[in-house]
Each structure stands twice: as structure tokens, then as C-alpha cells.
Amino acid sequence: MTTDVNICTRIFSHCHTQPERLALHIPQMQGLNYMGEESLTYGELGERCAQMQSALAKLSLQIGDRVLILARPKINTYILMLALFSLGLVPVLIDRGMSRDRIFASIKASKAKVAIGETSILRLWWLFPPLWTLKRYAFDGSSIGVKDFRKLYAAITPELRCELLAPTAHGLITFTSGSTGTPKGADRTHGSLIEQHLAIRAHGQDTPDDVDSPCFPVVVLHNLCCGISTVM
């Protein structure tokens, strides 16, 4: 793979060609209690990604900068990830099942410039010293020391953008509880994310009418590249 790429080119093409197709359907749970559900078509996905892109553009971030995502797998989480990918910014995910010390170390090692996520998580930022020096935004509200990311959205939905990058450009960094010693993030490039998608597609043989219910949240990225529906 030698030409410039972006994992989002495949996804955004579906936003234009099949805007009415269901992209994501995610139940909202509080413990074992069902609190409702979120659904999103590909057309809505493109519009909301464009809004998040407009907000990210106001944070003075440069291509290659890292953004720490502190949120559960929700529709806003996936929209944020796609907005970051498409602008050449790098989402950083941290396994919240790790010990407090390892979470501290992972945040430091991430070299993130900004933290964006849910109010329910970010409102506890003061308990995590590595977050003290980061800009903090929540995509679902605000709290003391946490700004409302939605206030940065453009008044009119802008055009959806997608920056083409070298295949070796950083795509996604994840810190998990499986590592030992000093936390080391698994670094997936845009090229490797695309190759992973193509490998899964060759093995799985998806069809246009598929509705998939993956157990592994990152597989949602593959499903979106295929243009199929995901129910979590």
C-alpha cells in the first residue's frame, strides 16, 4: 500500500451512497437496566461527523496529535473516533479495567493533547493528576473543569472532510490491561486498519443486507467500512 489513504474514505462513501441505511443501533444500559436506545443512519453519521470535525478544528490540533477518549462504546464515541481519523488525529483508548496506577501511566505515555468523552467519566478528572494539564471536553454536557464540546459545533453543518495520509500514519492507539511493566500502547496505522478490514472481509464474506452484532467494539469500524448495519 503506497498511495495516501484514510480508513474513513470507505465509511464516508456509504454516507453519500446509502444515507438511509442503518449504521448503528446501540442500547443504553445502566447496569442491567435498559434505559433506551440510540440509532443512526449513514447519512446522520456523516452529518454528525462533520459537526465534530468543525469542533475539533477549533482546538488548534495538528495532524498526528493524539486525543484521549474517555467514554463507553456509544454512538457519540464512534462519531468522535471517525472525526479524529478523518482529520489525521489519533484517538487513544485506555482500558478502564486497569489499576489506577496503570491508568495514570497510560495517560502519561499517551502524550495526548486533549481529553474528550462523557461527563460521567470526565467529572472525576481531579482524581487523575495526568488529566490536570489536558484540555477537557465532554460531548454530552459540562462539569467543573470540563467544557461542553457541543458549544464548538458549527451553526450550519459543514462539508464532511477526509484527509489522505501516508499508510504508516498513526491511526489508533490502545492501552490494555494485558501489557506488563511500563504501559505500551498498541499502535495501529491507517494502512494496518485498512488491511485488517480487508482481511476480515475476505474471511467473513459480508453481504449488503447484513446486520451484525459484534462482541468486540472495534469490529464496528470494519462493519462501517462494509456499509452494513451494526447492533450492539
Q: How would you describe each model-predicted region?
A:
Residues 71-72, 92-105, 119-121, 230-232:
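ATP-dependent adenylate-forming carboxylate-activation enzymes
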Residues 30-34, 120-167:
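ANL superfamily adenylate-forming
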Residues 39-43, 171-198, 229:
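Conserved AMP-binding A3 loop
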Residues 52, 82-87, 109, 224-225, ...:
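Short hydrophobic alpha-helices that are characteristic scaffold elements of the AMP-binding
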Residues 3, 20-62, 69-74, 78-82, ...:
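Conserved AMP-binding/adenylate-forming core of the ANL superfamily
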Residues 90, 194-211, 216-232:
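Conserved AMP-binding/adenylation subdomain of ANL enzymes
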Residues 19-22, 154-175, 182, 187, ...:
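Conserved pre-ATP/AMP-binding loop-to-beta segment of ANL
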